[in-house]
């Protein structure tokens, strides 16, 4: 039987009670909670010791050859069973991992903090008119509510605003969570599984007037891992300010984030998703230090976007640029599987094959700023835009650049690394091969235009016999002269 833990003053009620951490737990109480977390593992070890007498294969090996030489005949049920021992070893490791997560949870929940006020108290004070147009409290003073897996997340966000998930638990979203006020969700690495038939999992709506807290603005998710194997809808639908900090999106078959307002994604990971970040017209995307891997469309930009310091690998399309953007210090690797290239886009009225970096034609938009990027085994599509496309200090390693018919005179490649780049100009489209129907990024299927191209690499490549590489095009302000 498990021993009972006597209650102590100032100690959190336990891991299975819904209560906020208000007081500072004593060191003895922390040891008691950690000991309680190990009771289940210890009981399981004792039960295994009494039930089975066979030792693991790695620990107590039986010399079967010596027993056969001595005339001992082994029965069918005698001797070690490696398969059973492996199962026991896996169970033991899983129990150890659970114990580590339990200790981590205890440590996080019992750590002393300067939390003094609840969100509801701030709202009451705001209703009385005491907090209009002023910031009276800071983020660390707002009390944290530790969310239990059985609680309603939408109601908890309205009541507490600042939520923390337990790393030793997994959460399930079974209905749409509508957020209409400030929210700050701290994931602590917890896994949130989305299992609902609704169209949207998190609906982030416009926010009204409310109390001002320094460090709490808009809707923020930090260090949460979302799993969408069972979900077919949109993960985030936001028309308000949304910040995603260190969030993981794993195996989503639809859109991860769809925004009509400002969205900031920092240090996020998108793995095996259909569409990562989609910025609708008049939206503002800020994507930096994110990882995109094995996605079909990582980024779709219809408004403005700042895309910096990201890494992408094995994506059918890293960025589909319909609006305007700034691309700096990104590292993009193309796909090795040719089946990932069988998508088209109809963004400019013509069905072109979707490339790794696809810049759509637009009569009023300027070319994107493209500096200090690494493109490896990429295909790049350049549609017609205003001005000149002049990438600076970009490495086009084993990459292919496709130019639409009128783009040839608007591209300048002075100042790039062009040893293994190949440029092709579209002469016309072959009508005889329009029978191929491909899946489009808009959701339907279209007939693909197969272009007839002309290699213009040497016409656009810099004359290295005339232009020296020891010029300012390849230098940076932070480089030393010596």
Curated annotation (Swiss-Prot):
GO terms for molecular function: ubiquitin-like ligase-substrate adaptor activity. Residues 73-94 are annotated as: Disordered. One of its GO terms (cellular component) is host cell nucleus. Residues 83-94 have a biased composition (Basic and acidic residues). It is found in: Host nucleus; Host cytoplasm. The modification Phosphoserine is found at residues 476-477. Keywords: Early protein, Host cytoplasm, Host nucleus, Host-virus interaction, Modulation of host cell apoptosis by virus, Phosphoprotein. GO terms for biological process: symbiont-mediated perturbation of host apoptosis; symbiont-mediated perturbation of host ubiquitin-like protein modification. Plays a major role to prevent cellular inhibition of viral genome replication. Assembles an SCF-like E3 ubiquitin ligase complex based on the cellular proteins ELOB, ELOC, CUL5 and RBX1, in cooperation with viral E4orf6. This viral RING-type ligase ubiquitinates cellular substrates and targets them to proteasomal degradation: TP53/p53, LIG4, MRE11-RAD50-NBS1 (MRN) complex, ITGA3, DAXX and BLM. E1B-55K probably acts as the substrate-specific adapter of the SCF-like E3 ubiquitin ligase complex. Contains a PML interaction motif that allows the subnuclear PML localization. Interacts with host PML-4 and PML-5; this interaction promotes efficient subnuclear targeting of E1B-55K to PML nuclear bodies. Interacts with E4-ORF3 protein. Interacts with E4-ORF6 protein. Belongs to the adenoviridae E1B 55 kDa protein family. This is E1B 55 kDa protein. It comes from Human adenovirus A serotype 12 (HAdV-12).
């Amino acid at each position: 039987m498990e021993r009972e833990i006597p209650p102590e003053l100032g100690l959190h009620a336990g891991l299975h009670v819904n209560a906020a951490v208000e007081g500072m737990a004593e060191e003895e109480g922390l040891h008691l909670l950690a000991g309680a977390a190990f009771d289940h593992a210890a009981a399981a070890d004792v039960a295994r010791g009494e039930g089975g007498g066979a030792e693991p294969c790695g620990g107590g090996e039986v010399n079967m050859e010596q027993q056969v030489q001595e005339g001992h005949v082994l029965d069918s049920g005698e001797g070690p069973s490696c398969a059973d021992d492996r199962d026991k070893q896996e169970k033991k490791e899983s129990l150890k991992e659970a114990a580590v997560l339990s200790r981590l949870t205890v440590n996080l929940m019992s750590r002393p903090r300067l939390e003094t006020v609840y969100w509801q108290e701030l709202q009451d004070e705001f209703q009385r008119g005491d907090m209009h147009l002023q910031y009276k409290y800071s983020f660390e003073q707002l009390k944290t509510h530790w969310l239990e897996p059985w609680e309603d997340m939408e109601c908890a966000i309205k009541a507490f605003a600042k939520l923390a998930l337990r790393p030793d638990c997994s959460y399930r979203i079974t209905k749409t969570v509508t957020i209409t006020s400030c929210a700050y969700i701290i994931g602590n690495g917890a896994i949130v599984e989305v299992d609902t038939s609704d169209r949207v999992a998190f609906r982030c709506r416009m926010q009204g007037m409310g109390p001002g807290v320094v460090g709490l603005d808009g809707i923020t998710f930090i260090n949460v891992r979302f799993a969408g194997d069972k979900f077919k809808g949109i993960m985030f639908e936001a028309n308000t300010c949304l910040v995603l900090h260190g969030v993981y999106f794993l195996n989503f078959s639809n859109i991860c984030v769809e925004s009509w307002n400002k969205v900031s994604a920092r240090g996020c990971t998108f793995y095996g998703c259909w569409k990562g970040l989609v910025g609708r017209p008049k939206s503002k995307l800020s994507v930096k230090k994110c990882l995109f891997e094995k996605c079909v469309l990582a980024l779709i930009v219809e408004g403005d976007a700042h895309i910096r310091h990201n890494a992408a690998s094995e994506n059918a399309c890293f960025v589909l640029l319909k609006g305007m953007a700034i691309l700096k210090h990104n590292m993009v690797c193309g796909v090795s599987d040719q089946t990932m290239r069988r998508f088209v886009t109809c963004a400019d009225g013509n069905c072109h094959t979707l490339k790794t970096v696809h810049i759509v034609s637009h009569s009023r938009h300027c070319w994107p700023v493209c500096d200090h990027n690494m493109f490896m085994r990429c295909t790049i599509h350049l549609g017609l835009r205003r001005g000149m496309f002049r990438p600076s200090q970009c490495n086009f390693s084993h990459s292919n650049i496709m130019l639409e018919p009128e783009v040839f005179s608007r591209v300048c490649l002075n100042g790039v690394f062009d040893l293994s780049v190949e440029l092709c100009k579209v002469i016309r489209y072959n009508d005889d091969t329009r029978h191929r129907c491909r899946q489009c990024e808009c959701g339907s299927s279209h007939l693909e235009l197969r272009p007839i191209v002309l290699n213009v690499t040497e016409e656009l490549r810099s004359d290295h016999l005339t232009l020296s590489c020891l010029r300012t095009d390849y230098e940076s302000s932070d480089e030393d002269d010596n």
